[in-house]
UniProtKB/Swiss-Prot annotation:
Gene3D superfamilies: Ribosomal protein L33 (2.20.28.120). The keyword Transit peptide does not apply. Residues 30-39 have a biased composition (Basic and acidic residues). PANTHER family: 50S RIBOSOMAL PROTEIN L33, CHLOROPLASTIC, LARGE RIBOSOMAL SUBUNIT PROTEIN BL33C. Keywords: Ribonucleoprotein, Ribosomal protein. This is Large ribosomal subunit protein bL33B. The gene is rpmG2. Residues 28-54 are annotated as: Disordered. It comes from the Bacteria. GO terms for molecular function: structural constituent of ribosome. One of its GO terms (biological process) is translation.
Length: 54
């Protein structure tokens, strides 16, 4: 059942240092591609792009 969930939990990882900082949910019907957001990375101490990891 969890594999076909419409709003699965995803993990966002920093593009620069690869640290997994955020967990969020996304709607798989509206956003089938990988999600990318600009968020604050505490390790880099700056706003960087965070991409969805699998």
């Amino acid at each position: 059942m969890a594999a076909t969930d419409v709003r699965p939990k995803i993990t966002l990882a920093c593009v620069e240092c690869k640290e997994r900082n955020y967990i969020t949910k996304k709607n798989r019907r509206n956003n089938p591609d990988r999600l990318e957001m600009k968020k604050h990375c505490p390790r880099c101490n700056s706003h960087t792009a965070h991409r969805e990891t699998r």
